[in-house]
Amino acid sequence: MTGWIVLPISLTVFSIPGIWIVYAMAVMNHHVCPVENWTYNLTCTDDNTKAGTPKSCCTLEDVPLISKCGTYPPESCLFSLIGNVGAFMVVIICLLRYSQVIEVSQRSWLNTTALIAGCTNAAGLVMVGNFQVDYAKSLHYIGAGVAFPAGLLFVCLSSILSYQIAASALDYWLGHLRVSLTIVALISLVLSGVFFIQESFLMQHLAAICEWIFVLDILVFYGTFAYEFGSVSTDTMMAALQSSSARSCKSPGSSSTSTHLHCNAERIAMI
């Protein structure tokens, strides 16, 4: 058992309540309408709703998409913080998971692709969190267009890798759980995209709900790594470094055995 088990749990525990707080602040500040509202108007006159209570008149601009919830201050400040801190945690989790797979299995293109997808997901999160949709729409949509598909690709590949390195019945059970979460993520992301491009009030509201389901699902998926991270040690990161060093030592036409002996001799000489 190591302290790394706290990392994926922290990402889930920090991010899920965090974005709900952002949503609650946006609703109370009349920046979006509550998710349970299904009635929208083309236009609204001055809304006389009291401060601290949800809006009574909603338009298409008030649909509670996650991006809209984090557009205006003060909730935009918390939204950016969650995006930045969450992205940093995602990168560390992806690096640890990459190293852990190498430690128990051989290097594979699936593992490398999963690492790239996870880091790309983190980069997109930074853009989404720091470029609000109403002020930098192009950059915000680029970030979302990068973060969401990359996040989906990461969970897909991670689910496959879970089965490849499974060693116990509990490992396979966790693989089944991750596949279920991946299916939910795939369906919700596709539906969110389909609904979002429609101009109907109902479709836009459904897009917001699907977007929330997707994000919450991905955060829960990251939290499942707490199970494997209990076995992370100093040898875990060294496994990735040694694998990289071994590959860099290889030269065309040289045998595997002679190459390893040559590299080991070089390391000893350096010491």
UniProtKB/Swiss-Prot annotation:
Record has Hydrolase as a keyword: no
TM region positions: 4-24, 76-96, 109-129, 141-161, 183-203, 206-226
Entry's Gene Ontology cellular component terms: plasma membrane
Cytoplasmic side: 1-3, 97-108, 162-182, 227-271
Membrane topology (Extracellular): 25-75, 130-140, 204-205
Major site of localization recorded for this protein: membrane
Keyword vocabulary terms for this entry: Cell membrane, Glycoprotein, Membrane, Transmembrane, Transmembrane helix
Compartments it resides in: Cell membrane
Top-level taxon of origin: Eukaryota
Membrane topology field: Multi-pass membrane protein
Entry-linked InterPro entries: DRAM/TMEM150_Autophagy_Mod, Frag1/DRAM/Sfk1
Gene Ontology biological-process annotations: phosphatidylinositol phosphate biosynthetic process; protein localization to plasma membrane
Positions bearing carbohydrate: N37, N41
Family affiliation: Belongs to the DRAM/TMEM150 family.
Task performed by this protein: Regulates localization of phosphatidylinositol 4-kinase (PI4K) to the plasma membrane.
Protein name (database record): Transmembrane protein 150A
Species this chain originates from: Xenopus tropicalis (Western clawed frog)
Gene transcribed to yield this protein: tmem150a
